[in-house]
Design a protein with these regions (language model features):
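Bacterial Sec-dependent signal peptides at the C-terminal "C-region" and cleavage site
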Residues: 12-21
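Compositionally biased intrinsically disordered regions enriched in Thr/Gly
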Residues: 20-181
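Sec-dependent N-terminal signal peptides
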Residues: 4-13
Length: 181
């Protein structure tokens, strides 16, 4: 019975979640091409971006309120501050004394939309499920060149000093429309 209830709660959460939960942007910081994936869970945001020339994925964290998105990394003092409107994310990138304008446009041409990702998975992807002792959330950590990597975070508290948590990654192939790892 608990499994059936959990299944329906996941479907309700998945179907009636407020607002957009995932963006895949492409564009430029200054004159450098970049790709960014933004995952929104209520007002909390985690994101990754990479300079297309180098490919190294840089994690970012932040908040989204009334269309204003603020992201920063934990190490280098890098910050993005901008507005999301009409499928665009535009604003200012800062690192130390250096400031550049950025303009990113939502584009899924060589990536998977969240809807496609949901349909590829054997089990529905729930963006977030929470109760008193359990949290599960899914975000997209890479989405480029026909591959998408979904990061599934789970936390369970069952007593004691602290809870247990884990992260699982699933890689999907757009061309063959299947889970590959």
């Amino acid at each position: 019975m608990k499994k059936i209830l959990l299944f329906f709660l996941l479907i309700l959460n998945f179907t009636f979640g407020a607002g957009k939960n995932y963006y895949h942007f492409e564009g430029k910081i200054g004159n450098l091409p970049v790709t960014m994936d933004v995952n929104v869970l209520e007002n909390y945001v985690n994101a990754t971006y990479s300079y297309d020339k180098f490919g190294e994925i840089i994690p970012l964290f932040g908040s989204l309120e009334k269309g204003k998105l603020i992201l920063s990394d934990n190490n280098e003092g890098e910050n993005f501050e901008g507005i999301i409107t009409n499928n665009k994310f535009e604003g200012t990138w800062k690192m130390g004394a250096k400031t550049l304008k950025f303009s990113l446009v939502e584009n899924y041409k060589n990536s998977l939309s969240l809807e496609e990702l949901k349909n590829l998975n054997m089990n529905p992807i729930s963006l977030s499920t929470t109760n008193d002792n359990f949290t599960r959330s899914t975000s997209v950590s890479y989405n480029k060149n026909g591959l998408a990597v979904a990061e599934e975070y789970t936390y369970v508290y069952s007593g004691g000093a602290h809870g247990n948590y884990g992260v699982n990654y699933r890689t999907y192939d757009k061309k063959f429309r299947k889970l590959i790892s």
